[in-house]
Design a protein with these regions (language model features):
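Detector for small/aliphatic-rich hydrophobic stretches
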Residues: 1-81, 91, 95-100
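Conserved inter-motif catalytic segment of the P-loop NTP-binding fold
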Residues: 76-129
Length: 130
């Protein structure tokens, strides 16, 4: 393994699922205690990227983030979807308590547009979730 990668993996801000979390950092409960426990007992880390790796999409993975989406919607913040693999089903989200007026779907044309959009969403004070 390269020296720079080794150095990066030692950073406390990088959490790896097979290692216990070293430092408590701000987090949002997932709504599922078992999942919180897998995420170091805290939930989704705030101000961080969380990636869910799945064998296939469309198997109910949105249920993992639905409690967070509900909370963000109650706070009046905007939920951005960047290049979602499928169009979210608005009636189901509305039934689950997510205000669909706060959802913004963005399809970018290339990686440069995607990164520009992501950066601006993350910088915006109206953003609750990307």
């Amino acid at each position: 393994m390269s020296k720079s990668l080794n150095h990066l993996l030692q950073d406390a801000r990088i959490w790896q699922g097979h290692k216990p979390q070293k430092h408590a950092s701000p987090a949002e409960h997932t709504g599922y205690q078992v999942l919180d426990n897998q995420l170091g007992g805290l939930g989704w880390p705030k101000g961080a990227l969380s990636e869910c790796l799945l064998d296939s999409c469309g198997i109910g993975e949105l249920h993992l983030v639905l409690p967070l989406m509900q909370k963000v919607a109650r706070q009046g913040k905007t939920i951005f979807w960047l290049n979602p693999p499928h169009t979210p089903y608005a009636p189901a989200l509305a039934r689950a308590g997510v205000n669909t007026d706060q959802l913004v779907l963005v399809q970018t044309h290339d990686s440069a547009d995607f990164l520009w959009t992501l950066e601006n969403c993350l910088r915006s004070p109206v953003t609750g979730l990307v």
